Every structure is written in structure tokens, then in C-alpha cells.
């Protein structure tokens, strides 16, 4: 497991490498996308045996290349998150996955005040949550089980789905603009409408 840290191996990284989609993903297309020259601890491992669904792959690649929010829908266990992960691995794109189960709260997403020791003295300091941390870095964040997210969490995510993608931290009187290489993806089973079985 990779731990998010304040010491930043991601600082200054940009996707500068041109990647030939036909060569890397085996798809019949002339599409080229940008990726990172080298990987970091946040880049998923490549599964050489993974086979890409062409239509889904092109949609995800468009999300990476053109900074578009992409939601992948499908049944449980069909590899939605793995699909995004394996594309990120081949682009050397740092990625984190967040499962939006009932245990993920607004505080986890935004951050909270914490008591820390500084020079032997206890002080209160704001600790960024998952979303501000990722938003400021060249990271692809994947929200798994998007349709299962709690309402308070979904309101936080809603703001970064918009065109400018800025996140306002009211408690900190701060507005965070996204890193140019920040990307957002989601996976879902139902798209909020139930599925073909009526569940």
C-alpha cells in the first residue's frame, strides 16, 4: 500500500512522453496520448496478460489526454477499476483509488484539524484529505462504487467535476485549482438507475 505523504516525489512531474496507442494498447487507431517518462510509487504495476476492451480503452485514454471526467459502468467484478489502472500503468500516470463505501466521510475527502507535535509542542494543524492532496498533484484519482457514495461526500466531489474543477476549502479560506495533470475517473454498477436486472 502506498501512503500519501507531504514529501513530494510527484512535484514538477508532467506527462511529456508521446505514447502510440496502437503500439502500446494494440488498438487499431492513430491516436497518440501523453504519458510520463518514468513511474513513481503511485503508478500501478503492469499486468502483461491484461487485454483491453477497445471502446472502453479509447474513452479512458480520451479522459487522460483531454482532461475529461470519465465514468465506467458495468457489473460487479468485471474489471472496471482494473481497466483504468492498467491504462495508468502503461502511461506511467500516478493513480490512487478511493472506494466510496459508507466508511468514507467528508472529513476523509476534505481534511481535518489534527493535533501534532512541532518542536516538542502540541499544535493544531490542518491535514489535507484525499481530494485536496490529489487535486494539487499530477495524479489520476479513481472513485470506485461512485453510486454508493454518501451524500456529503458526493457534494464535495461535485465541485471538482465542473469545468474549472476548483475546490473551495471553507474552513481554510482557500481555493485549490487543480494541477494541469490531475485526472478524475469513476466506476459504477448502476449509474444511479439500477441495472438491467432491476436491482
Which role does the model predict for each range below?
Residues 2-199:
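AAA+ P-loop NTPase catalytic core and its hallmark functional loops
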Amino acid at each position: 500500500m502506498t501512503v500519501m505523504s507531504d514529501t513530494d516525489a510527484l512535484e514538477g512531474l508532467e506527462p511529456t512522453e508521446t505514447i502510440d496507442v496502437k503500439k502500446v494498447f494494440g488498438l487499431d487507431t492513430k491516436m497518440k496520448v501523453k504519458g510520463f517518462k518514468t513511474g513513481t510509487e503511485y503508478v500501478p504495476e503492469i499486468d502483461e496478460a491484461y487485454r483491453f476492451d477497445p471502446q472502453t480503452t479509447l474513452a479512458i485514454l480520451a479522459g487522460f489526454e483531454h482532461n475529461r471526467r470519465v465514468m465506467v459502468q458495468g457489473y460487479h467484478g468485471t474489471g472496471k477499476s482494473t481497466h483504468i489502472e492498467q491504462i495508468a500503468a502503461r502511461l506511467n500516470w500516478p493513480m490512487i483509488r478511493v472506494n466510496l463505501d459508507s466508511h468514507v466521510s467528508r472529513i476523509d475527502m476534505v481534511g481535518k484539524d489534527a493535533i501534532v507535535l512541532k518542536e516538542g509542542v502540541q499544535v493544531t494543524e490542518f491535514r489535507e484529505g484525499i481530494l485536496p492532496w490529489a487535486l494539487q498533484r499530477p495524479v489520476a484519482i479513481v472513485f470506485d462504487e461512485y453510486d454508493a457514495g454518501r451524500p456529503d461526500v458526493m457534494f464535495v466531489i461535485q465541485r471538482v467535476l465542473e469545468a474549472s474543477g476548483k475546490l473551495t476549502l471553507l474552513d481554510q479560506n482557500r481555493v485549490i485549482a487543480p494541477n494541469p495533470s490531475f485526472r478524475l475517473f469513476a466506476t459504477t454498477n448502476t449509474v444511479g438507475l439500477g441495472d438491467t436486472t432491476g436491482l
